[in-house]
Amino acid sequence: MSHRDLVPDEIADRVQLYWYFKENINIAIYGSFQQSRKRDLLALRDYLRAYGYLNARISEDYSDRLDPGTEDGPIKDTRLSDLLMDESSIHIFVFVKEHQDEHYLIQSVSMEFQRLSTLMQHGIKEDQPAAIYIEEGLEKIAGGVFKGRIAQNEHGWDIGFFKNIEQIYKPARRFCERSLARIYGF
């Protein structure tokens, strides 16, 4: 491999370009919105934004893009999820265990996870970096298809486990840094 020295102006230009990409790349965060779980996703989004990933988003961040007459409900939720996925280049999935009186927490995020995988399999979305964070213990009680998809990991996505949401902040930021470097060749 040949080595080429960068001139000072070129270094400054590359740094400026890096920050431009970092501030403008769309990062999707998927997970449950039930109870405190939505606050956790918002906290992760805000953490990434504080580190310069200004377009880290959850689906509700796209609400202003829909027709104002769109009624709240499952159709709106699906449209928002589709917008989030279709416009994002980096994807973060957060799978959590159900606590008492919580049900079907991973149903929607599992469908989003499968949708991205299918879009990639059919060449509709190019290779998309994704990180999958799983609350410890979920892997023991989840259904067989979920366990199989995680074990199979056909796209080579990052997989990590956590006890509380704060434990994924730094790994998610590092994942975004690696993904940005891969996408833009930095």
Predicted regions and their residues:
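Conserved catalytic or regulatory cores that recognize and/or transform ribose-phosphate-containing ligands
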Residues: 1-186
